[in-house]
Design a protein with these regions (language model features):
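Walker B catalytic acidic pair
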Residues: 177-178
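Hydrophobic anchor at the beta1->P-loop junction of P-loop NTPases
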Residues: 82
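Walker A (P-loop) ATP-phosphate-binding motif of ABC ATPase nucleotide-binding domains
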Residues: 79
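Alpha-helical sensor/transducer elements of the RecA-like P-loop NTPase core
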Residues: 3-4, 11-46, 50-54, 66-67, ...
Length: 264
């Protein structure tokens, strides 16, 4: 179940194993979400604050500094992809990264209903407003008028990209968690593609999900600006297995036993 590697060689290459990483602890909010319930949004539906707040593990099973370091080394890329099935600790790793990075982070937890372009753009505006207060007022106004005045998707997206281009400079990571739930939406794919092409230079996207996103990124890949972590990278290395059992489970294993765990 290994994916094709698009990134530079990883340090401390993980052992080959088909056994997934030990399930990680569920991330918790690092600060109270902006909303405890749904907040009315000008586009006509409610924004759920817990879907767009940064998160980090309250209690990780095991810190993974080699992967956090890998992230830090690749934040100058335009697109970072995390691709693995459930249970490999993708969200926990993103939480650990978000607490270590100096970059500002927008974290959007996706559901299938977010495949609607109005919903998707509305949440992006709300998330980016946590980074840039007052962001996207003109985009919001157009979203509000989609039904009343028939604002087209292209007009709204053009305004959104214009708002992005005029935003305050700085390093910003936009995390789209569980991206596989909306990857089938042509509208979402188009919006993400335009963001990759037109967003400010300091902004990069992190797509985390099951499988490789359906995006045309050949030009960016040719420029070395697409990086990927797959199942092989997310598996525990032998030293990580040894530390996990010794420090978390209180059951130290010898090297042979660690190898058995890795090969299960």
């Amino acid at each position: 179940m290994s994916g094709r590697r698009d990134d530079a060689a990883m340090p401390n290459q993980p052992v080959a194993s088909e056994h997934p990483a030990v399930p990680a602890a569920t991330p918790q909010q690092t600060h109270p979400p902006r909303l405890n319930a749904a907040e009315p949004h000008p586009s006509g539906f409610a924004i759920i604050g817990s879907k767009i707040g940064p998160a980090a593990p309250a209690r990780s099973i095991l810190a993974r500094p080699r992967l956090v370091e890998w992230f830090e080394q690749h934040t100058r890329s335009r697109l970072i992809i995390l691709s693995a099935e459930a249970g490999y600790g993708k969200t926990t790793l993103l939480g650990e990264f978000s607490t270590h990075t100096r970059d500002r982070v927008v974290w959007y937890r996706l559901e299938r209903s977010d495949g609607d372009w109005i919903t998707f753009l509305s949440y992006l505006v709300a998330g980016l407003r946590d980074v840039w207060p007052g962001f996207g007022r003109r985009t919001e106004a157009l979203l509000r008028n989609v039904a009343a005045m028939g604002s087209s998707r292209e007009v709204v997206l053009a305004q959104f990209l214009s708002d992005l281009s005029s935003a305050e400079a700085g390093r910003v990571a936009v995390i789209l968690d569980d991206y596989h739930l909306v990857d089938a939406s042509p509208d979402v794919r188009m919006i993400v593609s335009r963001m990759l092409e037109r967003a400010p230079e300091g902004m990069y996207l992190v797509l985390s999900g099951r499988g490789t996103p359906t995006l045309s990124v050949g030009r960016l890949r040719g420029q070395g600006r697409v990086q990927k972590l797959s199942i092989d990278d997310l598996r525990f290395t032998l030293p990580e297995i040894e530390k996990l059992f010794a420090t978390t489970y209180g059951q130290p294993l010898d090297s042979d036993a660690c190898q058995v765990v890795a090969e299960r």
